[in-house]
Regions:
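Peripheral (non-transmembrane) domains and long loops of multi-pass membrane proteins
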Residues: 1-5, 201-287
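Core subunits and conserved enzymes of cellular information-processing
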Residues: 2-213, 224
Length: 287
């Protein structure tokens, strides 16, 4: 994430992102996941199963459970409990409750469960990836993970996976084999989609440029793209001619400009361009 110098503006920016990401998740959960009884994905997956066995709706049970987990978080984690997680959990609970009251659904939006499964996977995954990228979470089973991490030596990933698997297995018996199979696909695809979205959110281009005259290229990087670079001297293994290597990293939109500029002013330059989704330092991810 780009650095924002003002603490106030940075806070506004981050909480704005949290709000948008939660709304994206809520749309996927409420309009696509709950009506089709897709029972994967932590608390919302568990709520889908519980709603079929009790008088609770999936939205109401999710809201109540998230609120209870918030209280447990304050009780067991105290000051270590993140405000971003509290805010995200409250926004999700309120949003689901409002949709339940003002936009009730009695059936899926379409007759294509596979299409709706794609949205039930993709939208929450995008929201989760955005939250993860700014160091927040949507609460739910994440709060359980925080408590387990503090008070036990249990493998948190295994515990959370078992919760997801239990919900999916229950869906076979409660909703039928077809819904159970869809839930299994959703569980398998969820993590892959989250990882893919996170990588693409942070994707940058890394340049290693070998050239004879570094000055115009460095000037363009600094003045034209507002980036910096590291320059070091090298020697060609075959020609033994002196060469200069320029190493720099930038966003994809800037990378295209730099590549075109180098082709125009230094056509003999050798460029090695690679992707990176985790660059830590000034101008990129915070330490």
């Amino acid at each position: 994430m780009k650095e924002i110098k003002s603490p106030f503006l940075r806070t506004i920016y981050e909480y704005g992102l949290i709000t948008v990401s939660i709304w994206i998740m809520v749309v996927g959960i409420y309009f696509f996941k709950f009506p089709n009884h897709f029972a994967f994905g932590g608390i919302t997956g568990f709520s889908t199963v519980v709603s079929q066995l009790t008088h609770w709706s999936a939205s109401d049970f999710t809201s109540v459970t998230n609120t209870a987990l918030l209280l447990l978080g304050f009780l067991f984690l105290g000051k270590g409990f993140g405000l971003k997680t509290v805010y995200a959990t409250m926004v999700m609970s309120v949003s689901l409750s409002l949709l339940e009251r003002f936009c009730p659904l009695s059936a899926p939006l379409t007759s294509q469960p596979l299409l709706e499964l794609m949205f039930a996977i993709f939208l929450p995954a995008v929201g989760t990836a955005i939250l993860f990228n700014i160091g927040a979470s949507s609460g739910g089973t994440d709060i359980i993970a925080m408590i387990l991490k503090k008070y036990s030596s249990m493998n948190i990933g295994t515990v959370l996976m078992l919760v997801d698997i239990a919900s999916v297995v229950a869906s076979y018996f409660i909703f039928g084999v077809e819904t159970g199979l869809f839930s299994t696909i959703g569980l398998a695809a969820k993590s892959l989609v989250i990882d893919y979205v996170i990588e693409n959110i942070n994707l940058c281009k890394c340049f290693n440029i070998i050239c004879d005259d570094p000055k115009p290229i460095c000037d363009f990087i600094i003045n034209g793209l507002n980036r910096s670079a590291t320059v070091y001297h090298a020697e060609g293994a075959f020609t033994h001619h002196d060469k200069t290597v320029i190493m720099t990293t930038m966003k994809r939109s800037q990378a295209l400009k730099l590549r075109n500029y180098i082709k125009r002013v230094e056509p003999t330059a050798f460029m090695l361009i690679s992707n990176s989704s985790e660059i830590i330092g000034k101008g990129f991810l915070a330490n």
